[in-house]
Amino acid sequence: MTVGPRDVRAAAERIAGRIRRTPVLEPGDLTGASVLAKLELLQHTGSFKPRGAFNKLLSSAVPAAGVIAASGGNFGLAVAYAARATGVSAEIFIPATSPEAKVARVRAQGAEVTIVDGYYAEAQAALADRQAQTGALLMHPFDQPEVIAGQGTIGIELDEQIPDLDTVLVAIGGGGLIAGIAAWFDRRVRVVGVEPVLSATMTAALEAGEPVVARVGGVAADSLGSARVGDHTFPIVRDQVDPVVLVEDDAIRGAQRAYWDECRLIVEPGGAAALAAIRSGAYVPAVGERVCVLASGGNCDPATVTS
């Protein structure tokens, strides 16, 4: 199944009243150029992820066993939030390497939490075993068409909030967010992808011509460190995103600090990557180009930004 503007519009209608319409602002002298920022860090749970979680949940027949997901970060929190809001049970498999603060937030939403020794791959394996036993509905963090379409509803808001928009910069992890936004705009607006140099999974896939397993790490690995991009997300990015640029960890940290210094906003590393691309010169807007960066999340320790 491919994802297009009709799917994104249907998702927007489906999740209406469930998610916040997040603001766009011109956040001071962040770049030396006129750049707008879409503040998805102000979304429920602190990231864009509830959009896709709600759309997948509300467009599916949910079995008695409820929903199931593997995530140590924003998606697990979003699934727990969406499940609670719709009266559905949720079990989230979380790697033992995840910060306890994030685990506590998932539990606070009422989800059952299963801690798995190891990393995300081990959590996914444990999830697959449990799903086979229970038949619970799988919620994938980025590679389901319903999730992609839900994330794409950000594009609808951008159309309404910035009608003269030329370009939007979006960070890439597994590709669900940028694929959804690109699917909505369908080349009417330029969509630029941003990856950390140390987690350049989409770049590796584009070079190989297909999704491949890549080494990931760096300051934004907790949100942008998918070792392989999605089978659904890859062709959308390949066909509708140009270019994909790379940013260093120092540039990401600098963008986080700029959000704090200019706007008093706590933006997580993955959420600051789009701004880092402009501040570092990885993407240079043309004269008069109307540009928006997506601040996709704010779930990090404030002390890492403000100190």
Indicate where each model-derived feature is located:
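PLP-dependent amino-acid enzyme catalytic core
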Residues: M1-S307
